[in-house]
């Protein structure tokens, strides 16, 4: 696999991760000011989500990522390309720490190391 192809796959993982962060921002906007006792039902939550710009940015990001994925799959076998999507399982939690103040336990960090090792082996 060429360096350009690896860069494309990493870029795809970052696009998907960005979409996930935007979906989280949407979810936080939906639940802003609510507690568990007066949380919105499914229909009310969907209707409120439709008014939140973060949702449209998330969907746009996923749309671009999907088109980019199709471009990638024209050039790289799925068996080589797909494991790189696991990079999102590394990127998203790290972003969640910095953007949302979420915490990761030690077992998650060990899992991240194994994911990174696996992707490195596949990329060779």
At which residue positions do the language-model features occur?
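Polytopic alpha-helical membrane proteins, predominantly small-molecule transporters/carriers
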Residues: 1-124
């Amino acid at each position: 696999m060429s360096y350009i192809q690896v860069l494309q796959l990493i870029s795809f993982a970052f696009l998907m991760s960005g979409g996930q962060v935007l979906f989280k921002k949407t979810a936080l906007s939906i639940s802003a000011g609510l507690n568990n006792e007066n949380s919105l039902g499914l229909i009310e939550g969907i209707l409120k989500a439709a008014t939140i710009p973060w949702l449209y940015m998330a969907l746009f990001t996923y749309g671009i990522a999907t088109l980019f994925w199709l471009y990638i799959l024209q050039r790289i076998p799925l068996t080589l390309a797909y494991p790189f999507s696991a990079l999102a399982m590394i990127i998203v939690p790290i972003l969640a720490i910095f953007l949302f103040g979420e915490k990761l336990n030690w077992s998650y960090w060990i899992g991240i190391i194994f994911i990174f090792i696996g992707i490195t082996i596949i990329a060779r």
